[in-house]
Structure formats: C-alpha cells, structure tokens
C-alpha cells in the first residue's frame, strides 16, 4: 500500500495486521500509513449467534480505539443462501429477514454503534453483496430502523452496483448518513455474465467482476460529485475484490497504482 502511494488502510481480517495496538501503530507509522478503520461482519438476527458477534465487534472497537482509528465498518456476515443469489435477490423480500429478524438486527447494530461511540469511533454500516443488506430497499430499511445519531452508511460503490443499486443515487438519498466510502469499479458485462450463469458471489469475483478504478462501468465521477455536493470529507478507501490464485487480476501493485492515479486525476478536476 505504501509503495502504491496510499496514505491509509483498514485493518483487514483479524490477524492480517498485528492485533497488538502498539505493534500495529509502530508498523503503520514506519510506512507512513494511517489506520482508518476495520471491516467487521456480524450475525445479529440469529439469537444463538448474536452475542458472539457483539463480543467480536467490541474487541475490534477496542483495538481501533487503542490504535487511533476513527471508523468501525460494520456489515452483516451473510450466509451461503444469500451468496448463492447475490445480485439476484428477489425484490419482494422473500429471501430476506423476517420482521422480527430485522428488529433484532437493527437493535444489535445500534448496540454495537453505541459502544463504538463511547470509545470515540464512528460507525458506518456497509451494505454487502451476499449479505442480508444488499438491495437498495434493504439499505433503506436499515437506515430507517437504526439511530441516525449512532449509525451511518459506508457507501461501497461496487457492492451497491452488484446488488442492483445506483451508487450515485444512494449517495444522494442517504447523504446525511454517509460516513465512510469504499470506491470500487465494476465491469457490468462480467456482472451480467455471472448473473446469467447464476454464479454465486465468489464465482463472480473469480471472473474479474471488479476492476481498477476507471477501467469498469461505474460512474465514479458522478459518485464523487454527489459526495462533494453534500460536503463529505471522510476517507476514500480504494478496493478491488479478487480471489487469490483464481482471479485473472494478476498484478495488485500495478492495479493499486492505476486506481490511485485515476482517483487523483478525478479529484483534481
């Protein structure tokens, strides 16, 4: 990341980077990288699993607070059922949470976000492909059911688009809730192929559905313009989902530099 010219990073999967805050800060400082936050998937709708998810979230929050990071990026962990129909989730809600599950999930998100605020962190909820908050309607439901003073939105352009949504419209509709941004580009022709073949989400990633910024089909300029219009001043996290050893994307350093060059050009315009 440092070699690519980036200024910050999220934590990544637990143990990907050091879990000791002193060691973590030392290693990041040596590379002149800021710790921005951490992606934390949770299962909160299931009574039998929610307590463990809350504990994991609290551990993540404690590490972020000790390391000086500003944002917890919370997401539903999803399951194989939703992964199998990623991008093809029925609009009628038949493959989604029940009313009771929505209530438990939203209450759990509020609980975690409240603890994050106590530790000095913002919480941004990340709609994610293959999770139960993927479709535009599901994003709206979660925003409606959670406390706006506690829970914001992490706008991930690639995941919103793969789920059938419009990142520009999401940025405008939920402007006051956007607290964090993941910038991805997506190849719509690859998405269409994956959906036509009824591939699960990992299968689509293996096809190379996500591209370096500027090489895909998304209106990233429009998204950034919409964010500017509402005064967004947070981090822009550049991402490109791949599967190691499977994806045709073979040069992560090259792609990371390419994405940064594109973003620098757009922001300077």
Give the label of every model feature segment:
Residues 215-229:
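A short, acidic, amphipathic alpha-helical segment used as a generic capping/interface helix at domain edges
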Residues 248-269:
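C-terminal helical cap(s) of enzyme catalytic domains, especially alpha/beta-barrels
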Residues 12-14, 40-45, 77-79, 128-130, ...:
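Active-site beta-loop-alpha junctions enriched in small/polar residues
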Residues 49-153:
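Active-site acidic/histidine proton-transfer and metal-coordination neighborhood
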Residues 8-9, 106-217:
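Acidic/histidine-rich catalytic cores of soluble enzymes
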Residues 1-3, 18-37, 55-69, 110-118, ...:
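Acidic (Asp/Glu)-rich catalytic clusters
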Residues 1, 9, 28, 64, ...:
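Conserved, mostly hydrophobic/aromatic
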Residues 36-38, 71-77, 175-189, 237-238:
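Non-cysteine beta-strand/loop elements that form the S-adenosyl-L-methionine
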């Amino acid at each position: 990341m440092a070699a690519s010219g980036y200024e910050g990073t999220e934590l990544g999967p637990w143990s990907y980077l050091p879990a000791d805050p002193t060691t973590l800060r030392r290693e990041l400082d040596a590379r002149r990288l800021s710790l921005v936050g951490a992606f934390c998937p949770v299962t909160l709708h299931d009574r039998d699993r929610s307590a463990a998810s809350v504990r994991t979230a609290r551990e993540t929050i404690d590490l972020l607070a000790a390391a000086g990071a500003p944002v917890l990026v919370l997401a539903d962990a999803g399951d194989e059922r939703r992964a199998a129909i990623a991008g093809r989730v029925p609009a009628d809600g038949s493959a989604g949470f029940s009313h009771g599950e929505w209530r438990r999930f939203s209450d759990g998100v509020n609980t975690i976000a409240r603890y994050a605020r106590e530790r000095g962190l913002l919480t941004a909820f990340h709609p994610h492909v293959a999770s139960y908050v993927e479709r535009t309607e599901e994003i709206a439901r979660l925003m409606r059911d959670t406390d706006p003073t506690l829970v914001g939105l992490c706008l991930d352009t690639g995941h919103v688009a793969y789920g059938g949504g419009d990142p520009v419209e999401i940025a405008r509709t939920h402007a006051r809730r956007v607290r964090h941004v993941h910038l991805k580009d997506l190849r719509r022709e690859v998405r269409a192929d994956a959906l036509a073949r009824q591939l699960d989400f990992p299968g689509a990633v293996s096809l190379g559905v996500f591209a370096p910024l500027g090489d895909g089909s998304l209106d990233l300029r429009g998204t950034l313009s919409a964010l500017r219009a509402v005064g967004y001043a947070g981090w822009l996290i550049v991402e490109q989902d791949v599967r190691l050893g499977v994806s045709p994307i073979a040069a992560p350093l090259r792609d990371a530099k390419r994405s940064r060059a594109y973003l620098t050009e757009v922001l300077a315009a």
